[in-house]
């Protein structure tokens, strides 16, 4: 399973974790990905999306219909 948000496109970030003695080791910061089910009233069906918590806020703000229309314009298959 990839840590990739379908709405915002957010992916893991990479960098170093630095210890007290300043030794560096590589690590990654994964976005908070949730699998959410939304109902599309226009199509009368449910869809399942893998979205970050920021993506959930975008859906709450803009509405699921607008977000799905935007994703389809970008070429994503929903």
Curated annotation (Swiss-Prot):
GO biological process, one term: translation
Pfam family of the protein (one): Ribosomal_L28
Assigned GO CC terms: ribonucleoprotein complex; ribosome
Record Gene3D superfamilies: Ribosomal protein L28/L24
UniProt entry keywords in alphabetical sequence: Ribonucleoprotein, Ribosomal protein
Residue segments, region Disordered: 1-29
UniProt biased composition (Basic residues): 20-29
UniProt-listed InterPro entries: Ribosomal_bL28, Ribosomal_bL28/bL31-like_sf, Ribosomal_bL28_bact-type, Ribosomal_bL28_sf
Molecular function, one GO term: structural constituent of ribosome
Membership in a protein family: Belongs to the bacterial ribosomal protein bL28 family.
Protein name, entry field: Large ribosomal subunit protein bL28B
Species assigned in the record: Mycobacterium bovis (strain ATCC BAA-935 / AF2122/97)
């Amino acid at each position: 399973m990839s840590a990739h948000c379908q709405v915002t496109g957010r992916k893991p970030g990479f960098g170093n974790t630095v210890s007290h003695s300043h030794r560096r080791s590589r690590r990654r910061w994964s976005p908070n990905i949730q699998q959410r089910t939304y109902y599309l009233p226009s199509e009368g069906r449910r869809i399942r999306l893998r979205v970050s918590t920021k993506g959930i806020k975008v859906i709450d703000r803009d509405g699921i219909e607008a977000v799905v229309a935007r994703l389809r314009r970008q070429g994503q298959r929903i």
